Design a protein with these regions (language model features):
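Extracytoplasmic/secreted proteins, especially bacterial periplasmic and envelope-associated proteins
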Residues: 43, 84, 88, 156-160, ...
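N-terminal "mature-domain start" segment
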Residues: 21-56
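Surface-exposed amphipathic alpha-helical segments
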Residues: 48, 138-174
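Boundary at the C-terminal end of the N-terminal hydrophobic targeting segment
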Residues: 16-18
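Sec-dependent N-terminal signal peptides
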Residues: 4-14
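Conserved polar/disulfide-associated segments of primarily extracytoplasmic proteins
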Residues: 51-153
C-alpha cells in the first residue's frame, strides 16, 4: 500500500510539473524585418530565428524548431520573362506538390494559395503581390511552411505577418 501511494504521489507531482513547463513558442513578441534595398517590411514572431541574407539581398528567411518551420519574405524585380501574375498564379495552382485547400484568386495585383505540401506533409501558405515601388515593379512573396502541429500558433501569427508584409517608405527606415 505504501508503494502504491508513493507511485500515485509521484504521478500527480509529475503531471503538475508537466503543466508548469513553459511552451517556448508562447509569450513571443513581434520583431520587424526591413529590407531597405527592396523597400519592404514584415513583422515576424520572436520564436523565429533570422537566417543569413541572400547575396542579392532580395529578402530574408527565418526558421524555428530545428528547421521544421520555414518562413521567407522575398522581393524580385518583375520581368515578363519570368511570366505574368496570371502565369505565376496558374503555376502555383498546377504545382503537383501542392494540395491546395484555400486560394484567394488573383485580383489586380495579388493572390494567396495555401494547403499541404505533398513532399513533406507540411502546411504551406503563400502570398504573392505586385509592388510598384519607386525603384521598379517588384514581385513580393511571403511563404510559410510548418508542421500541422503548429497550426494553432500560425493561425495567430499569419494575420499579423500578412498585415505587416508591405512596401516601406524608403526615408522612413533609412
Amino acid at each position: 500500500m505504501k508503494n502504491f501511494l508513493m507511485i500515485v504521489l509521484l504521478t500527480i507531482t509529475a503531471q503538475l510539473n508537466a503543466g508548469n513547463v513553459m511552451d517556448p513558442y508562447q509569450g513571443y513578441v513581434y520583431k520587424t524585418y526591413v529590407n531597405s534595398q527592396r523597400n519592404f517590411m514584415i513583422k515576424y514572431p520572436s520564436f523565429l530565428t533570422m537566417g543569413r541574407s541572400s547575396e542579392t539581398n532580395d529578402g530574408q528567411s527565418f526558421t524555428a524548431n530545428g528547421g521544421a518551420v520555414y518562413v521567407s519574405a522575398t522581393s524580385s524585380y518583375f520581368t515578363n520573362y519570368e511570366g505574368s501574375m496570371q502565369s505565376r498564379y496558374a503555376d502555383d495552382l498546377n504545382n503537383t506538390d501542392y494540395y491546395i485547400n484555400y486560394k484567394r484568386p488573383l485580383s489586380s495585383n495579388w493572390y494567396v494559395v495555401s494547403g499541404i505540401k505533398r513532399s513533406n506533409n507540411k502546411v504551406f501558405y503563400k502570398k504573392v503581390y505586385i509592388s510598384n515601388s519607386y525603384n521598379g515593379t517588384q514581385i513580393r512573396t511571403m511563404y510559410l511552411e510548418y508542421p500541422n502541429s503548429w497550426t494553432v500558433t500560425f493561425d495567430e501569427v499569419i494575420p499579423v505577418m500578412l498585415k505587416s508584409f508591405k512596401d516601406t517608405n524608403v526615408e522612413e527606415y533609412n
